[in-house]
Design a protein with these regions (language model features):
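Structural/interface elements that position substrates and couple domains in central-metabolism enzymes
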Residues: 1-282
Length: 282
């Protein structure tokens, strides 16, 4: 996992070795000797099985994300709160709490690549994995749904200044590959918006990877929010967890807040005179 790679290597949940010879297996066991001494679970298989373990694991986690996002979309049309639903679901030991946070969809270098690879592999085998295929389709639709949330919040997008907080596909990384923020920004720009953005780590990479995006990258949260018609949280960085809403209210042009990660309680934000729109909650 990006951001926790060293920790994951030193103490993984399990070790999977795919090999065709005892020599190769023994080499891998020597590499992981310390972890094996900790009595961590180890699975030894042929190469094809090991590869499928990787794809199946990532596709399953991606499916959890797309699933909870679909439930959140339903909550937007009824008097149900996805935050409470996710918490209650996560308390079920058969489900678990991880990857049940709704938002703008998954990104990065693994989930998009592995889900698409698994779908293509299945097609080539004549055995389309329909659930994974739907997971990809749901995720592809997320930026458009998030764009509509912003549009419903402020109306006409043209000539509006919109602040994007978070560009990396997740916190604690500077990776902008397949980041949901990028497609959301593209849609906003295509509809005539002016974009100001801030990310604690990913702005340099974003400028390099997407030089065609007409974005004003700012040095901090508050400079990004100055003169804004709508503040949008896209990545749940800890830096965004303690925003000074009194200060924000004094510098924005229009007090509109779109929380695509449900970082804040709606009533709290509204108490400062902001409108609030989250994902799957009123």
């Amino acid at each position: 996992r990006e951001g926790t790679a060293v920790k994951d290597f030193l103490k993984p949940d399990r070790i999977v070795i795919g090999a065709e010879s005892e020599t190769a297996i023994n080499i891998m066991k020597r590499i992981y000797a310390v972890q094996i001494q900790l009595d961590l679970p180890m699975v030894v298989s042929n190469i094809e099985t090991a590869e499928m373990i990787k794809y199946a694991s990532n596709a399953f986690l991606a499916t959890k994300i797309s699933y909870i996002n679909e439930i959140a979309d339903m909550c937007d049309f009824c008097n149900a709160d996805i935050s409470v639903i996710s918490k209650a679901m996560g308390l079920d030991s058969r489900i678990g709490p991880k990857f049940l946070n709704p938002g703008p969809g998954y990104g990065g270098s693994c989930f998009p690549k592995d889900t698409k690879a698994l779908v293509n592999f299945g097609k080539n085998l004549g055995c389309l994995p329909m659930i994974v295929n739907s997971t990809v389709e749901v995720n592809n639709n997320r930026p458009g749904i998030m764009f509509e949330k912003i549009k419903k919040t402020i109306g006409d997008i043209e000539n509006k200044t919109i602040t994007i907080l978070g560009i990396a596909f997740k916190p604690e990384t500077d990776d902008v590959r397949e980041a949901p923020a990028v497609n959301i920004i593209r849609m906003l720009l295509d509809n005539g918006a002016k974009i100001k953005a801030y990310d604690p780590e990913a702005m340099v990479n974003a400028e390099k990877a997407y030089p065609d995006l007409s974005v004003e990258y700012c040095s901090d949260v508050y400079s990004a929010c100055e003169g804004s018609d709508c503040i949008v949280i896209v990545t749940e960085w800890k830096d965004f967890a303690g925003l000074d809403f009194l200060r924000l209210k004094s510098i924005v042009r229009n007090p509109a807040f779109v929380d695509l990660r449900n970082m804040y309680e709606p009533d709290y934000v509204k108490s400062f005179g902001f409108s609030y729109k989250g994902v799957g909650r009123k």
